[in-house]
Amino acid sequence: ARFWMTFGQEYLTHLRVIQNIGMSRIDPIMYNGQEIVPIQFLKAVLPNPGDLGENYTGETSIGCRIRGIKDDKEMTYYIYNNCSHHAAYLETGAQGVSYTTGVPAMIGAKLFIQGVWKKPGVWNVEEFDPDPFMKELNEQGLPWHELFNIDLEL
């Protein structure tokens, strides 16, 4: 399995410029006799990300591409979810990145509170039965899809 994220060239260029001009620094610097932290200054002058959802277009795409051997045969498996920024905004007033972050966190909390995910000790969410979580994803607006034995470009 492999985790990856992709971004448009314009977005990557902006990130590179921010880094190259030192605005991603987290150490304090002196500016006009004031100590400031560049990344905190940048946050103060940029628009609040929560206010940008109305103009987002396109979709998020979150998935796992898996390749391995099963029953002595090479197999591929792709499980994924696409989420429309526009649909997420209409439902919540937030864009798809916020939606795909918040909904899974809510589901995890719900399963814990309901006692579905509860064991003595300390556990990571990945150690619990995934089936109730996957069922809830479908019911809470993040339906997932599966593709088998396709070219995954791995």
Language-model segments: residues:
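C-terminal catalytic/substrate-binding lobe primarily of soluble NAD(P)-dependent oxidoreductases
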Residues: 1-154
